[in-house]
C-alpha cells in the first residue's frame, strides 16, 4: 500500500479517514488486550492502537513488534478522548486504529535510546551513526543544513552567479595546513593533493571571464582538530570580478540576512558593525570577538607606568602593557580561591599572574591596592568606570600575551556571569588585517590569510623593506565569537604576486615551479577580483544552536580524524601499494 501521510503530519481534519503510514517503532506499550505503538518517521510521531475489537490480525502483529522495527500500518484516524490528548506532539489529538500491521523489517535492540535525550557517549553515537541520525534533533539539523544551502543557491542565482565545480585532484602547495595526498598510479612517485580550498581555480575562473562564481565546495586539511574543525569540511565559496571590498561585504550581508530569515524566521539588522583587526585585539583580545556582551579590555599602562607595583611598572618599561577588565558587580561572587582559579586559567594563555582589586564603597581593596597612590587609584576608577562591588582583573606582559589571556578570561567570565544572550546573533566584520605574520622559530613570514591576498596599494613598496607593516585588503566575518569565514581582494598583477612570493621566502624557481601557471595567467588581461569563503558546517552549527561541529555533518570524523563507523583510515593490500609504487615505512615507535 502507498503511504498517504507522514507520521508527524496526520491532521485533525483526517478524523474518519483511512490512512497508510510507514515508519519505525519508537515505543510499544502493552496494556493487556490493547497495544499502543508510537510510530516515528522523519516528521514526528503518531500513536497507533491495536485492539481485538478492530483487528485480531493487527493485534497479533503488534504483539511481535519491538523498538525500531519497520512497519506499514493501515487504519482509521480517530480523535483521542480529551483526557488522553498529548500536547507534546503535533498529532497528540488523534490516533490510528490499526486494521493491518505489516512488519517490513525487524531490528536488533539498539545500543542506545533513539531519542533527543539519549545519554549515549559520542563515540557510540558515531559508531552507529545510522541510528543516531534517526533522532529528531539530528534530522532537524540536517534539514536546516539543506534549507541554508538551498537559500544560498537561490540567492546567488538571483545575483547572476554560476555554480561551477573545481577539481578535487589538484597540486600540492606549500602554504597553509598540511595537504591530504593522493598517489598517482599513472605517474609513479608523483602525487595529487585534495584541495584545501578552490582558491586558485576560482581566481582562474575570473581570468576566464566568468565574473561571478560560487560553489558549495568540499575542502580538506590535514591539521590538528578541535570541536569546531573537521579534516573535510564544506564552504560557501564565492568570487567576483570588477568589485571593491564594499561590494563583497554588501553581497555577503544580504545573503546572510536571507539565510537567517529562512532558517530562523527573523530579520537581522544591516549593515553589520565593522572594526579593524587592531581594534578587535585591543578591545576584546581576539580577532574574532563575541560582541554579544561588553567586558572590554582597558589599557591602564599609562596610569601604572610609575606605580610602586613593580610587576606593572616593569612590564610597561620593557615595552609591554597592562590591561584590565571590570567584571561589574562580581566582587562578592568571587572568593580568593575563585580568583586563584581564574589566575590558573589565564596562565594557560601565557599570563605569569592575574592581579586583582575589589571595589568596596569608595575604596579599592586587594593584595596590590597598597602599591597605588590615591591619584593612581582615582585614575583607575575613572578608566574602568568602577562602582561598588566591581571586580577588576589585570594582566601585565607583552601585548600578545595580555590579549590572549584577558581575551580568554573575558569569554569565561561572560559565560559564568550570564552576560551572553544565547538567542542573539551578533555578526561583525573584522577588517584591515596585517598581510603577513612573522614566525620567530622559522625566521620567515607567512601569509595571514593566503599568498594571493592583495596588499593595500600604498603598502606594496613595503613588501621589500618592511613586510610587517603591510596591510591586507582582507576581511573576516565573525558570528558570536566564531570566525564564520574570510575573504579579500586578490592580487591580479604578476609583478605584485612575485613581490608577495619573495616576501614569503620563495625563490624565483620555487614560485615558478609551484605557481607558474597562475603567474602566466596574470599576463593575459586579469580583471580585479575578490571573494569570500564561509564555513557551511560552522554556520549550521551556530544557527542550529549546537556546540559541536560533528552534529551538523551526516558522517563526521573524530578528533583524531577517523571514522568510527567505517573504521577509516585503514590499511590497504600489498597489491594496491604495488600498483601505486608505494611502500609503507612506519615510525620506529610503532
Swiss-Prot record:
Its main location: cytoplasm. GO terms for molecular function: aspartate-tRNA ligase activity; ATP binding; catalytic activity, acting on a protein; nucleic acid binding; transferase activity. It is found in: Cytoplasm. Keywords: Aminoacyl-tRNA synthetase, ATP-binding, Cytoplasm, Ligase, Nucleotide-binding, Protein biosynthesis. L-aspartate binds at residues 175, 221, 449, 490. It is an enzyme of class 6 (ligase). Disulfide bonds: none annotated. Residues 199-202 are annotated as: Aspartate. GO terms for cellular component: cytoplasm. It catalyses: tRNA(Asp) + L-aspartate + ATP = L-aspartyl-tRNA(Asp) + AMP + diphosphate. It comes from the Bacteria. GO terms for biological process: aspartyl-tRNA aminoacylation. ATP binds at residues 221-223, 230, 483, 535-538. It holds the Pfam family tRNA_anti-codon. Its EC number is 6.1.1.12. Belongs to the class-II aminoacyl-tRNA synthetase family. Type 1 subfamily. NCBIfam families: aspS_bact, PRK00476.1. Homodimer. Catalyzes the attachment of L-aspartate to tRNA(Asp) in a two-step reaction: L-aspartate is first activated by ATP to form Asp-AMP and then transferred to the acceptor end of tRNA(Asp). This is Aspartate--tRNA ligase. The gene is aspS.
